[in-house]
Amino acid sequence: DSDGQLDWYLLDRPENQKLRKFFREINAFYKKTAALWEVDFDWAGFEWLVPDDNHNNVVVFLRRDKKGRDLMCAVNFSPNTYTNYRMGVPPHRRYVPVFNTDDPAYGGDGFGDSEAVMVEAVPSHGKECSAAIRIPTFGAVFLRGEGPFPRPRKKQQAKALEKT
């Protein structure tokens, strides 16, 4: 009814309070995270990591701010949870979780990475490095790339080859 009032009493329900908290916090997250809006109209601000995983109903992409800082977003459109979803990533030392739509504060189960995810020198999706993350059912996780990926020095590479 467009002429009536909103049903304000609905905010008394705990599940609606959690949903309200979710929208408050994701809007604040958007505003404070320049990678989500700063380079909106240029491909330099966006990169597909996993654009075509229709079997798992997952997409993963990066957003970048003007300083080149990466924010990875993995979205699961399926009723399955993924505990070890591997994808190729830019060479950072690690990816740190910064927002999870499955947080219990929003009515979720809290499934996702709570600690930093280390990047490994395991090729995947056309990249020389990859990471394995946890993605919740019908949810999204946002992770910030941190630090340069450690490259082995030439002496270390030579020693490693001698051992084999």
PLM regions with names:
Residues 1-164:
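Carbohydrate-interacting/catalytic domains
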